[in-house]
Design a protein with these regions (language model features):
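Positively charged, low-complexity intrinsically disordered leader regions
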Residues: 1-21
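A general structural signal for well-ordered alpha-helical segments in protein cores
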Residues: 3, 29-33, 71
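Gly/Ser/Thr-rich beta-alpha loop segments that engage phosphate groups in nucleotides
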Residues: 9, 27-28, 65-68
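Generic helix-packing signal
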Residues: 9, 37-40
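Conserved N-terminal subdomain of the carbohydrate kinase-like
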Residues: 13-19, 40-147
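Active-site beta-loop-alpha junctions enriched in small/polar residues
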Residues: 150
């Protein structure tokens, strides 16, 4: 079984008014794929000697991001989670979307925005960079698809 996430990739940046506190790959569809992978790997590892109980699966992201450091971070995180990233397109001269989670002085969540407090810049584009048809080898009735509205 293949579980495929489809959409534009986003880097989530956690920060307060003066510094970045953490970064991680974001966007709901990618988070779902990442968590499904972890859950199924944990499930399979609980059946060490009983191959018949294991679930045969592959998780894949079919998506797009900029050819920049934010895209590098996201892809590295996905690959470290054993997710197939070979269907991610890197766009030159495009910045990967970034979403900012603002924290108070105690690191409690305040709000989220598309604009960076510090630089006052926004790295968000209106329409999806994901263009074209889904590759035929990813199309099957047996697959599960997780979409991001583009």
């Amino acid at each position: 079984m293949k579980i495929i996430g489809i959409g534009d990739l986003v880097l989530d940046i956690y920060m307060n008014e003066s510094e970045i506190k953490g970064i991680t790959g974001g966007m709901s569809f990618a988070n779902v794929i990442y968590n499904i992978t972890r859950l199924l790997e944990n499930y399979n590892s609980s059946y060490n000697n009983n191959e018949g109980e294991k679930i045969d699966f592959e998780t894949i992201i079919y998506g797009v991001c900029g050819n920049d450091i934010s895209g590098d971070i996201i892809i590295k995180e996905l690959e470290s989670g054993n997710i197939n990233t070979s269907y991610i397109t890197r766009k030159d001269n495009k910045k990967t979307r970034e979403f900012y989670m603002y924290l108070d002085e105690n690191d409690n969540f305040l709000t989220s925005k598309k604009k960076n407090y510090i630089t006052k810049k926004e790295s968000w584009y209106g329409s999806s960079l994901l263009k074209g048809d889904i590759p035929e080898e990813l199309l099957s009735k047996e697959n599960i698809y997780v979409f991001r509205e583009c």
